[in-house]
């Protein structure tokens, strides 16, 4: 039986770390002039995936 392929879109967006999955914040790509400086600052950097979404991402990346 052939190997299962990972979802390539998910592989580009999530990175497995020891403490979970790292991901970039949404709403930070274009048309940022309307957004306040505070909101843009809060969306900077990466964050860990919420525990309720971990099972879905593991299935997409075939981690288990």
UniProtKB/Swiss-Prot annotation:
Keywords: Ribonucleoprotein, Ribosomal protein. One of its GO terms (cellular component) is cytosolic large ribosomal subunit. Pfam families: Ribosomal_L35p (PF01632). PROSITE patterns: RIBOSOMAL_L35 (PS00936). Belongs to the bacterial ribosomal protein bL35 family. HAMAP family: Ribosomal_bL35 (MF_00514). PANTHER family: 54S RIBOSOMAL PROTEIN BL35M, LARGE RIBOSOMAL SUBUNIT PROTEIN BL35M. This is Large ribosomal subunit protein bL35. It comes from Pseudomonas putida (strain ATCC 47054 / DSM 6125 / CFBP 8728 / NCIMB 11950 / KT2440). The gene is rpmI.
């Amino acid at each position: 039986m052939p190997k299962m392929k990972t979802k390539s879109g998910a592989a580009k967006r999530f990175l497995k770390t020891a403490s979970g999955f790292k991901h970039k914040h949404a709403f930070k790509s274009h048309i940022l002039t309307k957004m306040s400086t505070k909101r843009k600052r809060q969306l900077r950097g990466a964050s860990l995936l919420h525990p309720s979404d971990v099972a879905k991402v593991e299935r997409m990346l075939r981690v288990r």
